[in-house]
């Protein structure tokens, strides 16, 4: 009898049996791999999961509860932990159905692999190889290196397989070196298109008995103490959820009329059921129009959590769409649009999947810069050549700038309210409460939450990224962190700090009847006027009394009040929030009300993250948007360079009375041209009131009420869109731009 030769497959974020290159290779008789046994193992890693739920009473967890670096939040909260445990158990069940199994373990990866190798060797089982799939992330790369090092010292073959859960395989992008990856998504997209023809074929599910045998149970070493591995899915869920379920002190009650928009169970089985439902219900076809919804399970695909854990691959989603579009998938025969080719909805889903690919490639290109406060961009220089070194407000007293206002202690209080959803900004609070209750919130609100923290409050954006890491059920390291950078203005958004959302205007645009805010912030449900729903401090004393909100902190001390007129025209506000002259301190974050449409980034249809046209591009994630025909724009000249010890930045509002045009900008980044200033790279400013933006970012045409037609104005973005300036009394909207926050396709 030939001696046993085992291959250990250490699984991480590829929790699926189908379209799995390793399972496919091992089940293919032609591969001639030479292994008699396969031991798939999933390890709950100590550096990301609180393992105290695996420890029996009377014993102690040898590993401290993993916390985030900036905010000190749990690395994995209850919603993702539950989804992950369900996904692991679903894979275990699927493997059992074809004659194999999945070993579940807890602890540091290297310790678990070493224990398995040494234990199998003691039972005279030869471990021929350890295989893993490559994943992005500093911790993930560290796991790969430590396991590879152990294998090398032990004389065991180690192989790192490509991660193939994305839409376009790395070898099919045409990019030979990561430095060649464009820093603008649209440039990358144009290199890849047509998307429908680029995705590789999927790999089938291994047939029963096709995989190498699972080792006899008495040959497999036991879990190292003090951890005990649960024997049922329910027990496994409890083990990972129990240590982190009380993540917020004084968690508000779940609103009576609210329901989760993400009630889905984890695992490959549920993922494919979800895809079929979306196609058959018309959700894929209507996706382009529905994706900005706020309530319910079907306004977006809700496939992002499955993609994040590798329960399904992007190319599996793509080929399901192809089967629907071409009419070859008989199970989709009753779906609207079956056999009629691709449509705007399916095209948009593919674009979202490509954005997810792009975020991962950016992570590969920039590495650990993904987690640095200065982001991908690092140091910026303005058009005059002067280095701009802006910092961020922080709750960390050891790195806060001297004289920081608000103080670190006050920032800590603001963050607590931001996390709990009591800022007084209705859309922000509703999103944060939905998140803490369900682990999910829409792409639209994610964009606004990120912009509110980073742009309006100028608080270190990493607090928000870490909060999302803890709570999002669909957290993905590349998508989450790259998109937070995108919104914060330190990532690869060409508009950088200039892209700012006005959460009041966004609420009027996307929560038109206030249903979303009323659902998740029931305290404001009794208000009749939407402006009171979206900002309770605007309500009259009588209405506050009726609503029972007299003395409520959201009314008496809103974190960031924003004055906004219903006609979407700017109010005349003399106070300038966060205004800082050179060498002076910044005002308190709760000080003055911000001018109305203040640098609103309003998303509409069309556009792309860089403003150069294209589909309604994704986020997770996933982030900003542009003007909606209102005379509201933002200008950026210098950007800002942040470090962990810096903070803040100059920001003020300027009201141009003649044009009734609102500008919000950071730094001295534009100059007013009285008789027609220099415009963007595409043309000259027109009649009176033209502006010259630094680096030629925006050329705003003259002729708005006072000057005839202005050539080359009209708000051309980098000169790309530079139409003739508006007639007197008119204004041009900026090219509409949208980008999703946490990729949701």
Curated annotation (Swiss-Prot):
Residue stretches of biased makeup (Basic residues): 571-584
Provide the transit peptide span: 1-22
Composition bias, Low complexity: 591-603, 632-648
Q: Which Pfam families match?
A: DNA_photolyase, FAD_binding_7
**Keyword annotations from UniProtKB, A to Z:** Chromophore, FAD, Flavoprotein, Mitochondrion, Transit peptide
**Could you tell me which residues belong to the region Disordered?**
563-688, 702-745
- List the record's Gene Ontology CC terms alphabetically: mitochondrion
User: Any binding details for the cofactor?
Assistant: Binds 1 FAD per subunit.
Q: What spans are recorded as compositionally biased (Polar residues)?
A: 735-745
Q: What does this protein do?
A: May have a photoreceptor function.
Q: What is the protein name stated in its UniProt record?
A: Putative cryptochrome DASH, mitochondrial
> In which organism is this protein found?
Neurospora crassa (strain ATCC 24698 / 74-OR23-1A / CBS 708.71 / DSM 1257 / FGSC 987)
């Amino acid at each position: 009898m030939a001696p046993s030769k085992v291959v250990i497959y250490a699984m991480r974020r590829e929790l699926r049996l189908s379209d799995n290159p390793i399972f496919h290779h091992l089940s293919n008789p032609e591969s001639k791999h030479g292994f008699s046994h396969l031991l798939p193992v999933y390890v709950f890693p100590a550096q990301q999961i609180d393992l105290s739920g695996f420890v029996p009473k009377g014993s102690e967890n040898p590993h401290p509860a993993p916390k985030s670096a900036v905010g000190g939040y749990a690395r994995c909260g209850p919603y993702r932990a539950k989804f992950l445990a369900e996904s692991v158990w679903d894979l275990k069940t699927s493997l059992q159905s074809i004659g194999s199994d999945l070993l579940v373990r807890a602890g540091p990866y290297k310790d678990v692999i070493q224990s398995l190798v040494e234990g199998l060797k003691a039972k005279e089982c030869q471990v021929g190889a350890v295989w893993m799939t490559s994943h992005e992330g500093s911790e993930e790369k560290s796991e790969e290196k430590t396991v590879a090092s152990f294998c090398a010292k032990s004389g065991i073959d180690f192989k790192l397989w490509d991660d193939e859960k994305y839409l376009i395989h790395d070898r099919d992008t045409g990019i030979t070196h990561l430095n060649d990856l464009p820093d603008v998504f649209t440039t990358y997209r144009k290199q890849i298109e047509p998307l429908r023809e680029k995705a590789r074929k999927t790999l089938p599910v291994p047939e029963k008995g096709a995989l190498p045998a699972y080792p006899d149970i008495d040959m497999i070493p036991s879990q190292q103490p003090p951890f005990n591995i649960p024997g049922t899915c329910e027990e496994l869920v409890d083990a990972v959820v129990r240590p982190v379920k009380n993540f917020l002190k004084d968690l508000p009650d779940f609103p009576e009329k609210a329901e989760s928009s993400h009630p889905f169970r984890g695992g490959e089985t549920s993922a494919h059921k979800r895809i079929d439902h979306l196609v058959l219900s018309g959700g894929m076809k209507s996706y382009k129009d529905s994706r900005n919804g706020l309530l319910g399970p079907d306004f977006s695909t809700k496939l992002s959590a499955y993609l994040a854990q590798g329960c399904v691959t992007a190319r599996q989603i793509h080929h399901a769409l192809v089967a629907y579009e071409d009419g070859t998938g008989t199970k989709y025969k009753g779906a609207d649009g079956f056999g009629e080719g691709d449509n705007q909805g399916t095209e948009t889903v593919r674009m979202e999947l490509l954005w997810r690919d792009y975020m991962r490639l950016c992570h590969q290109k920039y590495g650990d810069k993904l987690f640095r406060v200065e982001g991908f961009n690092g140091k910026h220089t303005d058009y005059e050549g002067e280095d701009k070194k802006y910092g961020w407000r922080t709750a960390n007293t050891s790195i806060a700038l001297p004289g920081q206002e608000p103080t670190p202690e006050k920032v800590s209080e603001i963050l607590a309210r931001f996390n709990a959803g009591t800022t007084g900004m209705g859309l922000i609070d509703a999103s944060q409460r939905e998140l803490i209750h369900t682990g999910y919130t829409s792409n639209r609100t994610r964009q606004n939450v990120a912009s509110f923290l980073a742009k309006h409050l100028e608080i270190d954006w990493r607090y928000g990224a870490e909060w999302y890491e803890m709570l999002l059920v669909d957290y993905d390291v590349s998508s989450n962190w790259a998109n937070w950078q995108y919104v914060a203005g330190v990532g690869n958004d060409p508009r950088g700090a200039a892209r700012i959302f006005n959460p009041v205007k966004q609420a009027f645009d996307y929560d038109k009847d206030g249903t979303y805010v009323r659902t998740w912030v029931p305290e404001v449900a009794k208000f009749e006027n939407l402006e009171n729903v979206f900002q309770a401090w605007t309500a009259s004393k009588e209405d506050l009394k009726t609503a029972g909100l007299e003395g409520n902190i959201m009314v008496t001390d809103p974190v960031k009040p924003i004055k906004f007129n219903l006609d979407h025209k700017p109010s005349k506000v003399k106070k300038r929030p966060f205004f800082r002259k050179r060498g002076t301190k910044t005002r308190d974050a709760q000080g003055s009300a911000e001018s109305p449409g203040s640098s609103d980034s309003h998303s509409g249809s069309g556009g792309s993250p860089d403003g150069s046209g294209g589909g309604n591009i994704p986020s997770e994630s996933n982030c900003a948007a542009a003007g909606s025909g209102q005379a509201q724009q933002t200008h950026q000249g210098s950007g800002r360079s942040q470090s962990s010890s810096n903070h803040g930045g100059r920001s003020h509002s300027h009201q141009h009375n003649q044009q009734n045009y609102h500008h919000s900008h950071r730094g001295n980044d534009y100059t007013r041209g009285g008789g027609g200033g220099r415009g963007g790279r595409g043309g000259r400013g027109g009649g009176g009131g033209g502006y010259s933006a630094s680096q030629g970012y925006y050329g705003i045409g003259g002729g708005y009420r006072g000057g005839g037609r202005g050539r080359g104005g009209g708000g051309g973005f980098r000169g790309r869109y530079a139409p003739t300036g508006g007639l007197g009394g008119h204004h041009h909207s900026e090219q509409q731009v949208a980008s999703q926050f946490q990729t949701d396709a």
